Amino acid sequence: MQKMTIHEAECLLQEIMNEEDERFQMLVKDERKGVQKLILKWYKQKELAQKEREKFLEMSKYENELREKGLTYIAGIDEVGRGPLAGPVVTAAVVLPEDFYIPGLNDSKKLSEAKRERFYDEIKDHAIAIGVGIISPQVIDEINIYQATKQAMLDAVANLSCTPEYLLIDAMKLPTSIPQTSIIKGDAKSVSISAASIIAKVTRDRMMKELGGKYPAYGFEQHMGYGTKQHLEAIEVHGVLEEHRKSFAPIKDMIQK
């Protein structure tokens, strides 16, 4: 019988789920270097997939404990944009179904833009409910960034299509009667908070890219409003915009000059 090509072996390995598969045993006996490399790669991919499953299970601990108590609508809440000099603070509340699984889900800041966009679409497709809260720079200046973040989180909860039975919040406590747990670095410890961080990050990044189109001299689509050298130089040359947070240094100092 004619041996399969290396490409055919690669395609076959993509179909094989475990070592007991007769086709896998056949490939293991193939002594060609190209096939043996593919088998090594297959093992590495399986190992990575197992680690991702274990990490996801670990990040589902809070949700699973609450589900064991009979709760269904558990909302993870996170914010993006507390530190920038321009643009809104954006929060998201996400309620995920029990069978939800995305390998590699993590804090949005640790993901590439391409992965965030892909995960954003998957979360949108599978979440039970998603709520977003957006607070403008003007309101941030009026009530301060901490209060604005809290308000944005409350707005995100109010914008959910279901009433959550429990809130898992990244490092904040909210003035609400809904039971809640505040989790430090929650976006790396809870799948719901992680999903919320991705929704909030992609939502805000898209808004800042639009702002970049409106004000091309400022480069908002690159720094997302953070105080980079490029951003500060643009403010010095072109001035402060209505989208800037005038209560934040160094914008505040520039206005007072």
From Swiss-Prot:
Catalytic activity: Endonucleolytic cleavage to 5'-phosphomonoester
Record flagged with keyword Metal-binding: yes
Keywords of the record: Cytoplasm, Endonuclease, Hydrolase, Manganese, Metal-binding, Nuclease
CDD domains hit by this protein: RNase_HII_bacteria_HII_like (cd07182)
Ranges where the RNase H type-2 domain occurs: 72-257
InterPro entries tied to this protein: RNase_HII, RNase_HII/HIII, RNase_HII/HIII_dom, RNaseH-like_sf, RNaseH_sf
Major location (coarse): cytoplasm
GO-annotated cellular components: cytoplasm; ribonuclease H2 complex
SUPFAM superfamilies with a match to the protein in the record: Ribonuclease H-like
Cofactor note: Manganese or magnesium. Binds 1 divalent metal ion per monomer in the absence of substrate. May bind a second metal ion after substrate binding.
Compartments in which it is found: Cytoplasm
Cofactors required: Mn(2+); Mg(2+)
The keyword Signal belongs to this UniProt entry's keyword annotation: no
Pfam families named among the record's database cross-references: RNase_HII (PF01351)
EC number per UniProt: 3.1.26.4
One GO biological process term: mismatch repair
Transmembrane segments: none
Binding annotation for a divalent metal cation: D78, E79, D170
MF (Gene Ontology): manganese ion binding; RNA binding; RNA-DNA hybrid ribonuclease activity
Family as reported in the entry's similarity comment: Belongs to the RNase HII family.
Protein role: Endonuclease that specifically degrades the RNA of RNA-DNA hybrids.
UniProt name for this protein: Ribonuclease HII
